[in-house]
Amino acid sequence: YLAHQLDLSLGALGLGTLDLFHLHNPEQQLAHLGPEAFYAAIQRAFEACEGFVAAGKIRAYGVATWNGFRVPPGQAGHLSLARLLNAAGGAGGRDHHFRWIQLPLNLAMPEAFLIPTQEVDGTVLTPLAAAQALGLQVQTSASIMQARILNQLPDGFAAAFGLRTPAQAALQFTRSCPGVSTALCGMGQAAHVAENIEVMALPKLAPEALGSLFG
């Protein structure tokens, strides 16, 4: 199945190699399989991905999640970054190509920045801090929540951060969170592209300023 989907993607894009290949929402299989069978299945999927790397079809792989890294241990759908890395090591050894994770992060869904859900060497860290500690790159999805949060921001919020629009302020929050490598944001108009490029020219907000937004 993974090989078929990868070949479809390569054909649709007209490419010979993808920079990154994500397994999408694997946590949806946890309830059906149970933890042990789930992580065994993940290792087999990672073995397939290592084969794709060896064949030159992808350069790296990861997991794109919605709930998996945000919910705490013991809650349905929780994914352990440490166990995923163990699976990657079993699939590809120390030089495995499991390099990225994706999770939602925005002003309305700040869990990845605020809530410790991942145990790393006996310490429970936020998903972003855990990814940093484990050497993983992070993409954020829903960085401005498909614009649904923009009308909920208080008057003057954008101006307080030296920005023109609520969308810029929302994106600046997400891209500034320590550990975020890439903040994904869909753009349907050229004007939105220009608006977001303005944000990229600014320095990121300090962690203290980010934390102050949540009291």
PLM-predicted stretches and their roles:
Residues D7, P26-G215:
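Beta/alpha (TIM)-barrel catalytic core signal, keyed to glycine-rich beta->alpha loops juxtaposed to Asp/Glu
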Residues Y1-T17:
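An active-site-proximal structural segment forming one wall of the substrate-binding cleft
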